[in-house]
């Protein structure tokens, strides 16, 4: 199951994205658990590191999606972020937060379906047994398969990964 967060202040756009995802799920047999947030502040406050994929609007009242993505990256380096926006000019900044893609509004199911396979391939890189490790106030997800060995020095634990 892929856990998805949709952060979109426009209810119609959020529901349209949810409908497109549900149609894809029914057609391809991929199960989604979708949570919706109408603003970035609420999303960040409630974020528990369980999302695999975040669809983030950029232009929202209060904290915009780009600022929210920067804060999200401070907490979770591996979650897949996709911007859903009519503001293509933010593309360069999106790469600074390692955005997987940009989907331009208004949403189009055909164009979305062309991109979703590539997006889900990034999500699959997060799958598998993993552990969450806190370091310097940040949480990191480490895939068990990527751990070569673990070293203990005093009270420090060092993970050596591939």
Segments from the language model and where they lie:
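Helix N-cap/capping motif at the beta->alpha junctions
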Residues: 36-42, 65
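Non-catalytic signal-transmission and effector/linker regions of two-component phosphorelay proteins
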Residues: 1-5
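CheY-like receiver
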Residues: 45, 51-125
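Conserved binding/recognition cores within well-folded domains
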Residues: 114-162
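Acidic di-acidic motifs
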Residues: 8-10, 86
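Conserved sequence signature across two-component system core domains
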Residues: 7-8, 37, 54
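Two-component/phosphorelay signaling modules centered on CheY-like receiver
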Residues: 10-35, 74
